[in-house]
């Protein structure tokens, strides 16, 4: 709906803030769900160079709620190297569309894994997977499985 607000404000002459299309969350409602925001790893490498991008894929096998639900999937984080921010979050799994709001904030606020890692995520929830992925990319893996 932000695009509609943009158009209405533009027509009204209010000089609205330009919408960052990369910051619009994308969700495919299927089983399992697919959700993402920001750049894919390939897009990030094209924009910042392959040597300046790193990623981490957290397997939902390490997430207690996913084990309870009997579901599988992953959370993939893409960041720029040398302390750079998260530039993409990609998730596959049951109910991941419900997590994309936090991922959108992380991307839009240019948060680093080190910014997100100390934040507490409720247990047991699938949302913990987003926190665990940031812990791992920040060099502090907890329930990460290779």
Can you annotate each of these PLM segments?
Residues 13-17, 24, 29-146:
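Flexible, glycine-rich terminal cap/loop adjacent to redox cofactors
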Residues 1:
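Acidic, glycine-rich loop-and-beta core segments that form the ion-binding/anion-interacting portion
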């Amino acid at each position: 709906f932000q695009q509609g607000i943009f158009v209405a404000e533009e027509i009204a002459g209010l000089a609205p803030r330009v919408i960052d299309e990369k910051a619009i969350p994308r969700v495919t409602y299927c089983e399992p769900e697919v959700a993402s925001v920001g750049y894919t790893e390939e897009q990030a490498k094209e924009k910042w160079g392959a040597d300046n991008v790193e990623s981490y894929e957290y397997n939902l096998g390490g997430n207690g709620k996913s084990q309870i639900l009997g579901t599988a999937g992953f959370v993939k984080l893409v960041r720029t190297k040398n302390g750079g921010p998260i530039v993409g979050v990609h998730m596959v799994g049951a109910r991941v569309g419900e997590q994309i709001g936090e991922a959108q904030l992380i991307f839009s606020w240019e948060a680093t894994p080190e910014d997100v890692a100390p934040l507490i995520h409720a247990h047991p929830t699938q949302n913990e997977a987003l926190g665990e992925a940031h812990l791992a990319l920040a060099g502090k893996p907890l329930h990460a499985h290779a």
